[in-house]
Amino acid sequence: MAKKDGVIEIEGVVTEALPNAMFRVELTNKHVVLAHISGKMRQHYIRILPEDRVVVELSPYDLTRGRIVYRYK
């Protein structure tokens, strides 16, 4: 996977599944963000459930929203 410039990648745990493929994720630094699934994960039907460990990409412009890019097995 290619690294993107200016993107913050951080691990977290999904705490709640919301409508429209949105999730509330608690990050390792105890912040809570709203995250959606990346397009490739959607394309490959990767399911995300509460209590899953995930990697979230955050934009430096809005640290309250993110994109889930990986789910640990």
UniProtKB/Swiss-Prot annotation:
Location of the S1-like domain: 1-73
SUPFAM superfamilies referenced in this protein's UniProt entry, alphabetically: Nucleic acid-binding proteins
Pfam families tied to this protein: eIF-1a
Keyword RNA-binding attached: yes
Keywords carried by this UniProt record: Cytoplasm, Initiation factor, Protein biosynthesis, RNA-binding, rRNA-binding
Compartments it resides in: Cytoplasm
Keyword Manganese tagged: no
Cellular component aspect of the GO annotation: cytosol
Function per UniProt: One of the essential components for the initiation of protein synthesis. Stabilizes the binding of IF-2 and IF-3 on the 30S subunit to which N-formylmethionyl-tRNA(fMet) subsequently binds. Helps modulate mRNA selection, yielding the 30S pre-initiation complex (PIC). Upon addition of the 50S ribosomal subunit IF-1, IF-2 and IF-3 are released leaving the mature 70S translation initiation complex.
Subunit structure: Component of the 30S ribosomal translation pre-initiation complex which assembles on the 30S ribosome in the order IF-2 and IF-3, IF-1 and N-formylmethionyl-tRNA(fMet); mRNA recruitment can occur at any time during PIC assembly.
PANTHER family: TRANSLATION INITIATION FACTOR IF-1, CHLOROPLASTIC (PTHR33370:SF1)
Similarity section: Belongs to the IF-1 family.
Record's protein name: Translation initiation factor IF-1
Species lineage: Bacteria, Bacillati, Actinomycetota, Actinomycetes, Micrococcales
